[in-house]
């Protein structure tokens, strides 16, 4: 309906246009034929316009062909709207034939064919080959990236990567190809084969197998059960022994050792009662073991354990006790056993008893005192006191005074406790010896011995009582001295304490002390009143003549220069125990003296200034002298260029920037770039680090054994790559990593025939080049 309406509207418009165009285009006198042709033309235009409208929904109208008057063989009319005939329309007969089918196939093949492309140039083909080969190789190599990354990130690489399992050949194979050649080997093999010893380690020996064959089934089972039980018990005992061996408790091992010793002693007593001959043999074995211990240097404090304990003995009480036990063991082993005969025992009589009453420590101290080492006298003060009390009890106060002056600090109570313990042990030993000697000696000798032992015991009691009183009095003095002012401390002590000053250790004077003494002598030349000092010195010089000048020097050193002009008397005597400030001053002086002695023959300051002058001169820019002898004047041997010519051709260097250490006299700053240090500097942040402060922190952290433990030092300095000597390092295989290389047939085809490239390869080449 819409199409009809449009057609009517278009007809109306066309009629109006015709009416409008009549007076312009055509005259009234024109012929009717021309009008008809023009109408047909416009009508045809109108139909074409209508057919072009709404072509999608337009319905095809059936056209009717009319027979024409003139039929030409060259102008065949075709069905439909097409004006030209197609070859396919002519080939469509009523019935299909095979010949027409082949023609159709040929036509379809001709239609599918296109124009042949021009072949590529040789350069383009080679470039495509290179690109394809590069992409293929990169794809193959990219599969190794995880392996390479893993090896780079590893903390340590040990080559060869594959651990070769050692091939352990059984002993049968080894023995089959080996024969005994030397006579010793032949004898050993003959003995083994004679006794039917197995070459391997079977479960049962041939003897056991023969015994099993002779047994019944029940007996064999019982025997096997016994063997299993014995092996199980053996494994249990071995495991227990391993556990006990791992125990590090010294107390546990000491208890076990004592238990074993007691058990061995009981067994020896039982053996002595049952079988005396076997007991004698056992005693000989024990004596032989003791001789072996004496021959070895096990208890000489020269081993690694003893040295480590000696270092820690100052701080660790257990280490001190262990060292003491080892020393006592050494003394016990090195002591010679004196076996006296019966005649000597009868002749000795009372002399042996009297010698036994004297303690061994006194004899040792007396022997040491006569020896060539006088420095050992100070370490044996307690022993000398005991010897002095036994020789002359009246000199006891003097010896006590000497001992108190020499012992300092915390060592005093320890020495006193050791003395008391030693006294107690001596009493007990004396009591035992007296009990043993009562049965063997007559009554007369017994009385003399009892009287001698009573005297010794009384002396020891007096000694212990005096030590206790001295200890209490020293405590009271120490508490009272804390409240006494400094002036009272410097007052002269009574005559009984004179040995305290005499026993004070001497020290070498330093240069600073000599300077201070020089200053003090200047003050002394001014004739200051010193009556007290002179009086005290006059009293002491007759008693101790040789030590007087040394004491005078020490007393002068202890004088305070600030108190010289005061009315108070200067200090004469110092305390026996030095104060903390005095100890600190002495340490500083010793340190300075040590430095002076180390650099005694070196003028360090002068050498330093000379070195700095040389460094400054070397850093200054140098003048360039361009004078050439013989240019413009005579030249030769012995002739030098004139000064005028030198000034003319001398290029003076500009002054450089001021040095950083110009105003620092004690410092040399090297402004040159260190080539050796530059080799270790980095311009780019290394791989594992993500920020510069991480790298700086690792560089600043010391890795030496001085600042780290041994285990940390070894971990920090482990090499990146470790190779085992004697092993062949083979390259990594794809099968080891778990990757199999793909087939490269395409590349092989291209490389074999680069000139003949199929369409498939061309497409692949284009695709690879685009990618």
Swiss-Prot record:
Protein's cellular compartments: Nucleus, Nucleolus
Alphabetically ordered keywords of this record: Citrullination, Coiled coil, Isopeptide bond, Nucleus, Phosphoprotein, Ribosome biogenesis, Ubl conjugation
Compositional bias ranges of the Polar residues kind: 535-544, 740-751
Region annotation (Disordered) ranges: 23-49, 334-355, 367-557, 740-771
Coiled coil (UniProt feature): 40-67, 216-290, 317-347
Positions carrying Citrulline: 433, 589
Gene Ontology MF term list: RNA binding
Cross-link (Glycyl lysine isopeptide (Lys-Gly) (interchain with G-Cter in SUMO2)): 122, 449, 519, 733
UniProt KW Nucleus keyword: yes
Positions of modified residues (Phosphoserine): 29, 31, 52, 77, 81, 405, 407, 437, 445, 453, 569
GO cellular component: cytosol; nucleolus; nucleoplasm; small-subunit processome
Domain of life, source organism: Eukaryota
Phosphothreonine sites (modified residues): 205
Single biological process term from Gene Ontology: rRNA processing
Regions of compositional bias (Acidic residues) in chain numbering: 342-355
Biased composition annotated in UniProt, kind: Basic and acidic residues: 399-436, 504-529, 547-557
Compositional bias annotation for Basic residues: 753-771
Tissue expression profile of the protein: Ubiquitously expressed.
Post-translational modification: Citrullinated by PADI4.
Pfam families linked: Utp14
Function: May be required for ribosome biogenesis.
Family: Belongs to the UTP14 family.
Additional record remark: The human genome also contains the UTP14C gene, an autosomal retrotransposed copy of this X-linked gene. Evolution of autosomal retrogenes from X-linked progenitors compensates for X-chromosome silencing during male meiosis.
Subunit structure as annotated in this protein's UniProt entry: Interacts with DHX37.
Protein name: U3 small nucleolar RNA-associated protein 14 homolog A
Gene behind this protein: UTP14A
């Amino acid at each position: 309906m819409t199409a009809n309406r449009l057609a009517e509207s278009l007809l109306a418009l066309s009629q109006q246009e015709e009416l409008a165009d009549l007076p312009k285009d055509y005259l009234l006198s024109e012929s009717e034929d021309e009008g008809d042709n023009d109408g047909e033309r416009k009508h045809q235009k109108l139909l074409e316009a209508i057919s072009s409208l709404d072509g999608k929904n337009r319905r095809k109208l059936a056209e009717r062909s009319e027979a024409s008057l003139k039929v030409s063989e060259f102008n065949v009319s075709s069905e439909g709207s097409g004006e030209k005939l197609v070859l396919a329309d002519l080939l469509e007969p009523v019935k299909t034939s095979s010949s027409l089918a082949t023609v159709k196939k040929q036509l379809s093949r001709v239609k599918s064919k296109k124009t042949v492309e021009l072949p590529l140039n040789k350069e383009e083909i080679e470039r495509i080959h290179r690109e394809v080969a590069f992409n293929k190789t990169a794809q193959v190599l990219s599969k190794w990236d995880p392996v390479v990354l893993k090896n780079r990130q590893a903390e340590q690489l040990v080559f060869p990567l594959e651990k070769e399992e050692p091939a352990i050949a059984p002993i049968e194979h080894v023995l089959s190809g080996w024969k005994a050649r030397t006579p010793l080997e032949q004898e050993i093999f003959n003995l083994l084969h004679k006794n039917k010893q197995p070459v391997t380690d079977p479960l049962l020996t041939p003897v056991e197998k023969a015994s099993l064959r002779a047994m019944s089934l029940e007996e064999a089972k019982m025997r096997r059960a016994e063997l299993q039980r014995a092996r199980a018990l053996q494994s249990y005992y071995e495991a227990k022994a391993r556990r006990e061996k791992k125990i590090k408790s010294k107390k546990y091992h000491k208890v076990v050792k004592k238990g074993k010793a007691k058990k061995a002693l009981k067994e020896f007593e039982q053996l002595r009662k049952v079988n005396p001959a076997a007991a004698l043999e056992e005693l000989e074995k024990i004596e032989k073991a003791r001789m072996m211990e004496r021959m070895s240097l096990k208890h000489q404090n020269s081993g690694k354990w003893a040295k480590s304990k000696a270092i820690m003995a100052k701080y660790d009480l257990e280490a001190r006790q262990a060292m003491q036990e080892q020393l006592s063991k050494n003394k016990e082993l090195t002591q010679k056993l004196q076996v006296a005969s019966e005649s000597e025992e009868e002749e000795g009589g009372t002399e042996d008893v009297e010698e036994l009453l004297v303690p061994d420590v006194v004899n040792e101290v007396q022997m040491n005192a006569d020896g060539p080492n006088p420095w050992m006298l100070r370490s044996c003060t307690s022993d000398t006191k005991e010897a002095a009390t036994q020789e002359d009890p009246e000199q006891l106060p003097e010896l006590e005074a000497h001992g108190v002056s020499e012992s300092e600090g915390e060592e005093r109570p320890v020495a006193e406790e050791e003395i008391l313990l030693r006294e107690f042990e001596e009493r007990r030993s004396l009591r035992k010896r007296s009990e043993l000697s009562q049965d063997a000696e007559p009554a007369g000798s017994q009385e003399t011995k009892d009287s001698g032992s009573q005297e010794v015991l009384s002396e020891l009691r007096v000694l212990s009582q005096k030590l206790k009183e001295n200890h209490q009095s020293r405590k009271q003095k120490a508490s009272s001295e804390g409240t006494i002012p400094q002036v009272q401390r410097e007052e002269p002590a009574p005559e009984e304490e004179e040995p305290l000053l005499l026993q004070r250790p001497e020290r070498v004077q330093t240069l600073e002390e000599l300077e201070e003494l020089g200053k003090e002598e200047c003050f002394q030349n001014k004739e200051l009143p010193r009556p007290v000092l002179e009086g005290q010195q006059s009293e002491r010089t007759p008693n101790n003549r040789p030590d007087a000048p040394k004491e005078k020097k020490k007393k002068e050193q202890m004088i305070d220069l600030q108190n010289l002009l005061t009315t108070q008397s200067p200090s004469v005597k110092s305390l026996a125990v030095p104060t903390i400030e005095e100890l600190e001053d002495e340490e500083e002086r010793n340190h300075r003296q040590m430095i002076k002695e180390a650099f005694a023959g070196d003028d360090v300051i002068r050498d330093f200034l000379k070195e700095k002058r040389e460094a400054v001169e070397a850093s200054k820019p140098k003048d360039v002298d361009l004078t050439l002898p013989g240019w413009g004047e005579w030249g030769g041997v012995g002739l030098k260029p004139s000064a005028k010519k030198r000034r003319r051709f001398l290029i003076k260097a500009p002054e450089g920037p001021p040095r950083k250490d110009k105003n620092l006299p004690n410092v040399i700053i090297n402004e040159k770039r260190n080539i050796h240090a530059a080799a270790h500097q980095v311009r780019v942040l290394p791989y594992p680090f993500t920020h510069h402060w991480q790298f700086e922190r690792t560089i600043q952290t010391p890795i030496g054994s001085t600042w780290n433990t041994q285990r940390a030092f070894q971990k920090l300095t482990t090499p990146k790559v470790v190779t085992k000597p004697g092993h062949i390092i083979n390259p990594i295989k794809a099968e080891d990593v778990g990757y199999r290389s793909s087939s490269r047939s395409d590349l092989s085809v291209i490389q074999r025939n680069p000139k003949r490239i199929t369409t498939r390869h061309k497409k692949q080449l284009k695709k690879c080049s685009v990618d």
